[in-house]
Amino acid sequence: MAKRARLRLILLAKLVSLKMSDEKEKRSLRPVAFVAVVFSTVAITSCLITFPLILHYIQTLESQVQLDLEFCQARARDMWKEMLDIETGGKKDSAKLANIVLNHRRLEKRDTLQDFWARRLHDQELRDQPVGYDNPSVGVESFNSEGGGCCTCHRGPPGPAGDGGRDGADGVDGTPGEIGPPGPPAPPGPDPHSLFPPQCPCEAPPGDGGPPGQPGPDGPPGAPGNAGEDGKPGDQGPRGPPGIPGAPGQPGRPGPPGEPGTYKTEVGPAGRAGAPGRPGPPGQPGPAGPPGENGKGGGQGPSGLPGPPGQPGQNGAPGEVGQPGDNGAPGSCDHCPPARLAPGY
């Protein structure tokens, strides 16, 4: 029994301590959960706001770049038109245009990236605007084969060798060569003592002492010292908390029988008056009394509940035509895309 009681007390104490610790943990985790919810809400809101802004910026940048490219292409075409007009004198001569194209083709191997794109734009311009053929025989030769038929390859014979190309860029520096053999010994130079006159021997007084040097590094650690004497015993600690109350002890042995009591017949003094007793039960009902007088008439009672709704009445006559409303607000062009204009406008 005693062991069971102790176990019950220990279990109760542990349960109480666990409940207290759980409540403390819950209270400590409440602010952490609140902060986490706030930060997650802010992060999601910022993402919902920034993603559409980024997409709008990318679309605007793409449209601007496309406009710049179209403007550059248009300006390049205009420049090529002006150059062709200057070289041909404003006349659409097929022979001159063919010579210009051949001259540009000869520089194909030496063209840079800029020349390549310029040639492409020039060819496209020639395709877009075909020239007239006033004299179709100019610059055109017919080549016949040995059998007398037309040439089927549609190519002319190879032309003469072109001019020499431009000089190439300088090559990379070569690796350094090996070390050569040592050269012959150099002739002896003049004696340095002969350049200066002899000096008289003299002794100067010693100078002042220099400043103290910086402290040297720390020395190695010394050997361990001897063990110290044992300390004095400490003072007596405070009294500990009271322990868990023990289980109730076993009942004691029954005591010996007591001595027989004495019976006294003397009458003692009269005691104090007792408290009043409880009230008795109710009596039987009495006879019926005479009838009372008639009461006065009552006042008007409250109003009753409203009745059901009646049938709908007939439609009224049509009203007069109302006055015309005010003019609406003028429309805006916020929903329209930006106009495609060249840069600088």
Swiss-Prot record:
Chain residue ranges for the region called Triple-helical region: 156-185, 207-263, 268-333
Keywords assigned by UniProt, alphabetized: Collagen, Cuticle, Disulfide bond, Repeat
Listed Gly residues bias regions: 292-304
Biased composition (Pro residues): 179-191, 198-223, 278-290
SMART domains associated with the record: Col_cuticle_N
Entry-linked InterPro entries: Col_cuticle_N, Collagen
Pfam families linked: Col_cuticle_N (PF01484), Collagen (PF01391)
Keyword Heme among record annotations: no
A single BP term in Gene Ontology: collagen and cuticulin-based cuticle development
One annotated Gene Ontology cellular component of this protein: collagen trimer
Ranges for region Disordered: 161-345
GO molecular function: structural constituent of cuticle
Annotated function: Nematode cuticles are composed largely of collagen-like proteins. The cuticle functions both as an exoskeleton and as a barrier to protect the worm from its environment.
Family to which this protein belongs: Belongs to the cuticular collagen family.
Oligomer status and interactors: Collagen polypeptide chains are complexed within the cuticle by disulfide bonds and other types of covalent cross-links.
Name of the protein this chain belongs to: Cuticle collagen 14
Organism: Caenorhabditis elegans
